[in-house]
Amino acid sequence: MHELASNVQEQAGSFKDADALNIAFRFWRPAGEARATVVIVPGFNAHSGYYSWVAEQLVAERLAVYAIDLRGRGKSEGERFYVDDFADYVSDIAPLVDLVKSRETGLPVFLLGHSAGGVAACLYALDHQQTLRGLICESFAYELPAPGFALSAIKGLSHVAPHAHVLHLKNEDFSRDPKVVQAMNADPLIAQESQPAETLAALIRADELLKQSFARFTLPILILHGTADKAAKASGSQHFYETAGSADKTLKLYEGGFHDLLNDTGKSEVMGDITRWIDAHLTT
C-alpha cells in the first residue's frame, strides 16, 4: 500500500497553521511539467501515507499530488484525533491549497476528500469554489450508520466528556484486501485510533451545516461510494448528488465496495474513473 514505483519520489513537507500547529503533508510530482494538482484530505483511520499508490497513478497522468495530515492525525501536531470544530480542519486545508498554488503556479487544483476528510473538503470548497477546478468526494461521511438517538447521545456526551474516546472504527470495514487491513493494524499512527466524543459531535454539526448548504455548490463534483460501506452510508452521497446545486455533477456507486475505495480490491476501477473525470475537466 505504501510502495512506490522507482520513478515516483515521495517527499515530505510541513507548515504552521493558524493555531501554530505544525501540519505535515506529503507530495509527489511528475518528472516533467505537471498538468494540474490534486490535493488529498484523508479521513479517519488514515493519513497521507495511505495515498502513495494513488499518487503513483496520478503522477503517471502528469498530475502533482499533495496529501495532508489534518491536525491531530498522521505526523501533524495537535491532540490525537481531536477537533472541536471542522472549521479547524478547513483552516489546515486552506494554507496547503495556498502553498500548492504558489508552488504549482497557474495549474488547476482538484480537491479530493475521503470520508470525514470529504466533509472537511466540502466545507473548504463551499467558500473557495473559484479556487478549485473540481471537488472529488469519496465515501462521504454525511450519513452515519447510527440511529438518531445515538447521534444525539454523542452530542450530549461531548458537553460532559469531550475528550473521551468513544468510537473505534474497524480496519476490516475499510478494505476487502487483507494486506491493506494487516498494514493498517500494524501502522503505529492509527493502531490505537479512536474518535473523541467532541470530534464526532463536530462531524455531526458539520454534516448538519452542509445539509443546509448543498444547493450553494456550483463547481464540478465527482461523488464516489461503495454500496457495502459500513462506516458511512451510500445514501448520504446519493443525497449530496441530488441536492448539490452544481450543474456538472457525477455520482458513481461501486457494488460491494468498502469504505476506503482507493485501498479496496476495486481500486483500479475507482482510480480510472477519477483520472478520466479529471482529464475531462482539464479539456473543457
Model-derived regions, located:
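N-terminal cap/lid segment of alpha/beta-hydrolase-fold proteins
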Residues: 1-32
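Conserved alpha/beta-hydrolase
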Residues: 50, 55-78
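Alpha/beta-hydrolase fold nucleophile elbow
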Residues: 104-115
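Alpha/beta-hydrolase-fold enzymes
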Residues: 114-195
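Short beta-strand/loop motif that positions the catalytic acidic residue
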Residues: 217, 223-225, 229
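Catalytic active-site module of serine/aspartate enzymes centered on a nucleophile-bearing elbow/loop
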Residues: 255-284
